Every structure is written in C-alpha cells, then in structure tokens.
Swiss-Prot record:
The keyword Transferase applies. Catalyzes the condensation of pyruvate and acetyl-coenzyme A to form (R)-citramalate. The gene is cimA. It catalyses: pyruvate + acetyl-CoA + H2O = (3R)-citramalate + CoA + H(+). One of its GO terms (molecular function) is (R)-citramalate synthase activity. Its EC number is 2.3.3.21. InterPro entries: 2-isopropylmalate_synth_dimer, AIPM/Hcit_synth_CS, Aldolase_TIM, Citramalate_synthase_CimA, LEU1_arch, LeuA/HCS_post-cat, LeuA_allosteric_dom_sf, PYR_CT. This is Putative (R)-citramalate synthase CimA. Gene3D superfamilies: 1.10.238.260, 3.30.160.270, Aldolase class I (3.20.20.70).
C-alpha cells in the first residue's frame, strides 16, 4: 500500500462479482453466442472471480440455456442469473441451474413511480416476497437497489431491512446512471455499512457515465463494501461499468486488498473479451490498453532502460502485458541503439545522431515509423545495401460471392524465387496463408500474435493502417510492424513482410 493511501481502512478481502456476460452484453451492438459466453466464463473462472453473472435467464430460451451450460461446467465461481422482482424470473434461474440470483429492486422515485407505476410500500412487499421465494428454491440471494444513488438513505434502509429479513445474503448499492462522486459514495456506503452491520456483504455496482465508475467503486471499498460489480474492459450499457482490471489492480496495488484475482491473466482476458464482443479496447486504456506500457519519449524510454520504475507504476508482467518501445518523432538515442543492437547493427555516435535526425523528419511528416524504416535508414547511413531476406515480386487475389477467396504469391527469399497459393476466409487471409506456405517450404516460420486494421480516412478509398504483432517460435522474439495503404491486402502483406524481415534480422544478430 502506498503511503498516500495509508489512512484508508478497506477490508482485507473483496469479492469480485463479474457481470460481463449480463451487463457487459448489454453494450449496444454486442450479442454473444452460448459458446462465446462459455469461453469467457471459463476464463473468468480461471482468473479467480467469485461470482459470474452469466445472464438473465428469463430474457429468452437461448439465454436460459447459455446460463445452464455454464452452470454445468462445475466452475469454482458461483454462477448467477439476474432477476426482476418477478417470481417467474426466479423460476427461470432455477431452471437454468444457477447457484444464485441477483434480484434488481428499483428504489428511486423516478423508477418506482414512472417505470414500475407502483408506490414504495408495494416495492417493499414485492421485494420481500421474491427474496423469500428465491430462498425457498435454494438459491443464494443478492439484491441490488437500482438507482440507489438517487434514492434517499432512509428508504434504502427500509429496503435492506426487508430483504435481509426475507433471507437476502448480499445487499447492493447501485450507481445506475453514474451520478455519484467518490466523496459521496464513501459517505453513503459508510452509513449503509453501519446500518447493516459487518456480517452482511455490502456490494456496489457503478456505471461510468461521468468516467467515475472505478473511482466510485474504490471509494465504496474504502468505506467498507466487501463486493464489487465489474465487467472486463469496463463494457456495458451507455458509457459502461467499472472495469474489472482497473478495480482489481487499484485495490491490490494501492490499498493492499486481496481480490483473489490472478492478475497475470488480465491482459489475456481483456483480449478475449475484446475479440468476442467486437468492442475495441482504446490504446490508452489503463492496465490492458496497447499503450499502457509503451514508451516513445526519449526521456521516458531512457529512464525505463535505466530503472523500470521511473515511468511505470507496476511491472507489465504483473498484469500479463509487455513493455514496448516505439519509434516516433519523440524517440531518443537510447531506444534507437537498443533496437539497432537487436538487429545486429552497430553504429557510432555520429551515425546514431544522423539516424535520429532522419527518424524525426519522418515523424514530423506524420508517418508511423516501423522497425523496417529504422533498418532502412540505418543501412543507408552506413552506406550499405538494404538487407531484405524476403521480398514480394508479385501477388494476386481472387474473391467473389460464389468464389472461394484465393491468392497466389511470388516472393524472393535470399534471392531464391518461390511461388505459392492458398485459399482463405477472405483475400487478406488467403494472401497471408500463401505467404506462410512459401516461407515454410524454405524453413521460415512465424506466429501471428495480433492483427489490427484501422481506417485512417473516410470513404471507400480510405487509407487503412494495419498493425501486426509477430513471434519467432524458435527464439520467442516478438516484433510489431505496420503499413498504411488504400488497399488493405497490400497494407497487410507489407506489414507481415516487414515484421518477418525484422525477426530474421534479429535472429542473425
């Protein structure tokens, strides 16, 4: 725990209630198949979450079956279904074989009167009945006070008392539209904690409408909350929810709270959810974003090379990430020398400064600088011909509505001409598979770790930037490379070729 946080008095342990498969799936445009839900649930279980809210069983037959499939996996995590104050929702949770039910109890004036068209006494009675019904059916019961942060505490006390009396085991305080500030959250949870006592698990569920979800969740824990609702990557309705990876790392690193999470798996989990939901993780996303441990500035990179703690709060390995140094107009000599050394290129101080000047000129023109650019500049400064193990002479692709995407390619490998062809799910896939086939025949192998394509301009003639991350299966070396073109197939092929040449240059060194 950092000294600045030493006055905090959070609990020693906090339960992690993950709602990626329920609230997270309510992200506009996201619809997970039962198989995709199962894959995420398994990964959540592997990293150590306490509860997986697998969905809302009463929503559809497919949702019920998906929850049942997860429940039958015999995971260590508790499997939970959401429910309204409706006995039929509880029946659906039972049919889905869930361990627990999360009953949502609307409490604010606008929710009770405008949405439910009930009065508060009716809500109390309905909540009490449904909690008792769920308990009678053998379910662990958690209730959440929907829009709790816009509800006066006196009424929340009544709701909590009624639900506890009916058998609820966990009580939730919800910032449903993200209007709470951390100071207010701390005070409210402190009062609720005092009301319900230490034996009851008080939970908190925060939305990110004003960008405060993580801060509010942490404030609630500082005030005594012993369970937090989170989603992977912070996905969810509107602006999303408190992010699992952020909340966990803040609690573990800044407050010394044990979350039970295997943090070294967080980045892996993040990428899985990103891939299956299609919701991109911003590069600057805390903890798991592509740039979370990436350095370009010469001053920062030089500091990192001397002592990693100068510009990193934690080692990237702690969350399963990796440290990267990228080339750009802010780069310094330390990073250039390090990358040239990896390529087996030795330069003196004067040559190093000339390479730096040329790289900065490229950066000033708005170009994304790759290792291939650095290698080409270095070889020019050294006055020797560019070494390219692999060059593309030509390639063609064919695709159509009733045509299987097919590609053929002609490459030169150390001067030897090689032809290959392949099919794929699309022209990019077919082209890269043809390249792989040509290289494997010559004993050259690589693994694709990550592929990203992004339109830089609008229109059908948009410039597309492709980034790839490649690994040498023999040495374990990883390189990043990229290319920008109007043609995504050309951009992809160039990015792969540059990356493979970088791997081979490193291997030679």
């Amino acid at each position: 725990m950092r000294e600045a946080n030493a006055d905090a008095d959070p609990p020693d342990e906090v339960r992690i209630f993950d709602t990626t498969l329920r609230d997270g799936e309510q992200t506009p445009g996201v619809a997970l198949t039962p198989e995709e839900k199962l894959r995420i649930a398994r990964k959540l279980d592997e990293i150590g979450v306490d509860t997986i809210e697998a969905g809302f069983a009463a929503a559809s037959e497919g949702e019920l079956k998906a929850i049942r499939r997860i429940a039958r996996e015999e995971l260590d995590a508790e499997v939970c279904s959401m429910a309204r104050m409706v006995k039929g929702d509880v029946d659906a949770a039972v049919e889905a074989e869930a361990d627990a039910v999360h009953i949502v109890v609307p409490t604010s004036e606008v929710h009770v009167k405008k949405k439910l068209r009930m009065d508060r006494e009716e809500v109390l009675e309905r909540a009490r009945e449904v909690v008792e019904y769920a308990r009678d059916h053998g379910l662990t019961v958690e209730i959440s006070t929907e829009d709790g942060t816009r509800t006066e505490l006196e009424y929340l006390y009544e709701v909590f008392d009624a639900c506890l009396e009916a058998g609820a085991e966990r009580l939730g305080y919800n910032d449903t539209v993200g209007v709470m500030a951390p100071e207010g959250m701390f005070l409210a949870v402190k009062k609720l904690r005092e009301r319900v006592g230490e034996d009851v698990i008080l939970s908190v569920h925060c939305h990110d409408d004003f960008g405060m979800a993580t801060a509010n969740t942490v404030a609630a824990v500082r005030a005594g909350a012993r369970q937090v609702h989170v989603t992977v990557n912070g996905i969810g309705e509107r602006a999303g929810n408190a992010a699992l990876e952020e909340v966990v790392v803040v609690l573990e690193e800044l407050y010394g709270v044990d979350t039970g999470i295997r943090t070294e798996r967080l980045t892996e989990l993040s990428k899985l959810v990103e891939r299956l939901t299609g919701v991109r993780v911003p590069p600057n996303k805390a903890v798991v974003g592509e740039n979370a441990f990436t350095h370009e500035s010469g001053i920062h990179a030089d500091g990192i090379l001397k002592d990693e703690s100068t510009y990193e709060p934690i080692p990237p390995e702690k969350v399963g990430h990796e440290r990267r140094f990228v080339l750009g107009k802010h780069v310094g000599t330390s990073v250039i020398r390090k990358k040239l050394k990896q390529m087996g290129v030795d330069v003196d101080d004067e040559q190093l400064l000339e390479i730096l000047r040329r790289l900065k000129r490229l950066g000033d023109r708005g170009k994304r600088i790759t290792e291939a650019d650095l290698r080409a500049i270095a070889e020019d400064v050294l006055g020797r011909p560019a070494e390219r193990d692999i060059e593309v002479e030509d390639f063609t692709t064919v695709t159509g509505k009733r045509t299987i995407p097919t590609a053929s390619i002609v490459v030169k490998i150390d001067g030897t001409r090689k032809e290959a062809a392949s099919t794929g799910v699309g022209p990019v896939d077919a082209t890269i598979k043809a390249l792989e086939r040509a290289l494997k025949d010559q004993g050259i192998d690589f693994e694709l770790v990550e592929y990203r394509a992004e339109a830089l301009t609008g229109g059908t003639d948009a410039i597309t930037h492709v980034d790839v991350k490649l690994r040498d299966p023999e040495t374990g070396d990883i390189v990043h490379s990229g290319s920008s073109r109007e043609d995504i197939v050309v951009a992809s092929l160039e990015a792969f070729i540059d990356g493979i040449n970088s791997l081979m240059a490193r291997k030679r060194s």
